[in-house]
């Protein structure tokens, strides 16, 4: 199969090779070589004609130019190479570092309390939204959307009054929108089901298992390359009601399951053939970012993984569960809704709220197809300014933290360093950079901020000329436990605000592939570190090769030709992806108030911290709740 397309794919890294950055700071002199006014904000990159990041393909997410300055700051050699710091002369009521949902929500909450406050929001990426990015494609003359990061409105627990209130203020009613716009049963109405792709490198031969209704697991696996014993054990684990822990109460079983991995449960409790492990290994990737070796059995029980149906476990959360499993096992989770661009629409609605002239439209439905005017995001006359391509490199209280009345923030943009000032600062960036931005923090707080290691992941979005092969094979999504990407699925079908998803297999379609580059056998935080290194050292060409190879092998029996049927690729790489959630297998059970995320988010003078890391929960409601807390601490 050809590695390259018959026609070249449009892909480009925005201003490849040009250092891009974030930031702002106060008049003063806390950074080397501070000089007079030097920032021509109206001549900035984001004001250039045709500037529109959502439509870019190639490497997105943490794109080239978004992280290099922060890495130099981490490595201790930024300031020695930075040159003079230029004073912008700008002073604000609030500077927010990070234009993700948490940062934008912080700006929103601040203006709720302080009317016409002047706010500067800085972000190191070329687009706002943080992880809540969107990818736009024009296919067959029609706009097609897909999430580049945060997938949907969803949480293990009901949204708080604060988070729910923000959604309602923005005009988002998830329940009503879900009923009106989200066609969840569309693919099943066509007879499409889940598939499982067994790759030859892991299972000795390429084979697609279709999980068809009305068939047993023995029937589904009969022609697969799995050994007869592995087939029999998978069928037993999926279907049999066996108590593998006889003589124990439900609570006793739960306590034991909380301290063993699902892998150990399968091998040592259910006594499954070792070949079964590979079949289930990646099933936890999408939720936890690591395999079944690093996720407790009690965690996956909450997600109805097989093997527990005969244990007679009482419903409900249990001690020892992480935030995700405990939430779903207890409250059952929040309402859910998927915008066509994931939660990027929430970020766009927040920007409309803060800078109305930049985002046309009037409601939560029409924002989906709206085209942002990026040139209006950073205007001197606007009370709220959003400055992209600007990497914060310093945030310090002016004077002693206990008595400080203002803050200085420094940032790098276009190879220069600038400073601006404010009465307060919210750091809505990732926890791991904060000790380097605020070197004056107490050492114990710095250590707490460094504790969590964000989960790395890849969302690769691929444009297809049509999706006939999926229809021919009878699948809408495919789990691939041994492959480079652990899943591939057709885009969700959502019709909203004049935007309509494709319906015919003959029409162009977007599909998403997910990769979590974990390293089985290591503790989760070490797996995350290894995965971060893997992602940042993988070229677009390598991602593209694996996309073409894997889709070709899965879909070729349905008539798919990777060389001609793939028309565009966008790879969203997130080396610092999901917020770290404490893992019962590896992390202690801290007393109330002593967990690293709680210690790490403490206010420091006129600087407060807001992000999903601060909540130790990789969900949008956590990002919103932490933004509200940070603003309350500074108000």
Task: Label every model-predicted segment.
Residues 111-135:
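Glycine-rich FAD pyrophosphate-binding loop
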Residues 238-390, 401:
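Active-site/ligand-binding neighborhood in enzyme catalytic cores
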Residues 140-231:
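Dinucleotide-binding Rossmann-like beta1-alpha1 core, especially the glycine-rich loop
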Residues 380, 384, 388-512, 516, ...:
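Mid-domain catalytic core of redox enzymes
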Residues 1-10, 37-39:
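N-terminal secretory signal peptides
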Residues 44-83, 136, 200-202, 412, ...:
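Conserved flavin/dinucleotide-binding core of flavoenzymes
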Residues 93-120:
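N-terminal Rossmann-like FAD-binding beta1-loop-alpha1 element of flavoenzymes
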Residues 47-48, 52-55, 130-161, 305-328:
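Glycine-rich active-site loop/strand segments that organize a redox cofactor
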């Amino acid at each position: 199969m050809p590695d390259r397309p018959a026609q070249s794919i449009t892909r480009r890294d925005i201003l490849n090779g040009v250092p891009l950055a974030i930031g702002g700071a106060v008049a003063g002199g806390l950074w080397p070589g501070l000089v007079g006014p030097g920032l021509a904000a109206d001549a900035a990159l984001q004001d250039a004609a045709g500037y529109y990041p959502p439509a870019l393909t190639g490497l997105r997410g943490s794109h080239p130019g978004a992280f290099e300055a922060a890495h130099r700051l981490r490595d201790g050699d930024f300031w020695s190479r930075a040159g003079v710091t230029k004073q912008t002369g700008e002073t604000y009521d609030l500077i927010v570092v990070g234009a993700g949902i948490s940062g934008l929500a912080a700006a929103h909450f601040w203006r709720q309390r302080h009317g016409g406050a002047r706010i500067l929001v800085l972000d190191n990426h070329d687009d706002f939204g943080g992880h809540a990015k969107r990818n736009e494609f024009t296919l067959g003359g029609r706009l097609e959307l897909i999430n580049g990061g945060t997938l949907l409105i969803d949480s293990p627990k009901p949204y708080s009054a604060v988070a729910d209130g923000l959604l309602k203020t923005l005009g988002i009613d998830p329940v009503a929108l879900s009923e009106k716009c989200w066609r969840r049963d569309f693919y099943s109405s066509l007879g499409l089901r889940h598939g499982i792709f067994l790759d030859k490198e892991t299972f000795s031969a390429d084979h697609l298992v279709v999980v068809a209704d009305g068939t047993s697991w023995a029937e589904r696996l009969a022609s697969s390359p799995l050994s007869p014993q592995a087939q029999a054990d998978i069928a037993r684990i999926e279907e049999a009601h066996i108590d593998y822990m006889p003589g124990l109460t439900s609570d006793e079983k739960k306590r034991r399951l909380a301290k063993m991995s699902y892998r150990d449960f399968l091998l040592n409790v259910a006594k499954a053939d070792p070949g079964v492990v590979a079949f289930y290994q990646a099933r936890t990737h999408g939720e936890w970012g690591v395999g079944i070796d690093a996720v407790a059995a009690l965690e996956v029980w909450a997600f109805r993984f097989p093997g527990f149906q005969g244990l007679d476990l009482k419903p409900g959360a249990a001690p020892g569960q992480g935030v995700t499993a405990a939430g779903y096992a207890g409250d059952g989770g929040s309402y859910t809704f998927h915008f066509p661009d994931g939660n990027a629409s929430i970020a766009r609605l927040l920007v409309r709220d803060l800078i109305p002239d930049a985002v046309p439209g009037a409601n939560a439905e029409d924002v989906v197809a709206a085209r942002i005017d990026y040139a209006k995001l950073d205007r001197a006359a606007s009370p709220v300014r959003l400055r992209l391509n600007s990497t914060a490199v310093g945030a310090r209280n002016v004077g002693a933290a206990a008595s400080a009345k203002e803050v200085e923030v420094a940032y790098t943009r276009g190879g220069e360093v600038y400073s601006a000032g404010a009465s307060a600062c919210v750091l809505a960036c990732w926890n791991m950079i904060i000790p380097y931005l605020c070197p004056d923090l107490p050492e114990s707080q710095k250590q707490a901020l460094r504790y969590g290691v964000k989960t790395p992941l890849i969302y690769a979005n691929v444009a297809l000329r049509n999706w006939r092969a999926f229809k021919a094979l009878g699948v809408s999504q495919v789990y691939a436990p041994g492959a480079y990407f652990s899943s591939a699925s057709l885009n969700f079908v959502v019709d909203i605000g004049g935007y309509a998803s494709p319906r015919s297999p003959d029409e162009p379609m977007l599909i998403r592939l997910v990769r979590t580059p974990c390293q089985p056998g290591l503790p989760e935080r070490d797996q995350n570190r290894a995965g971060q290194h893997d992602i940042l050292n993988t070229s677009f060409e390598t991602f593209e090769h694996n996309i073409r190879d894997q889709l070709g092998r899965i879909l070729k029996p349905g008539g798919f030709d990777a060389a001609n049927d793939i028309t565009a690729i966008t790879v969203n790489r997130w080396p610092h992806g999901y917020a770290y959630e404490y893992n019962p297998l590896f992390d202690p059970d801290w007393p109330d108030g002593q967990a690293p995320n709680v210690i790490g988010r403490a206010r420091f003078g006129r600087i407060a911290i807001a992000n999903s890391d601060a909540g130790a929960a990789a969900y949008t409601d956590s990002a919103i709740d932490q933004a509200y807390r940070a603003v309350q601490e500074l108000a």
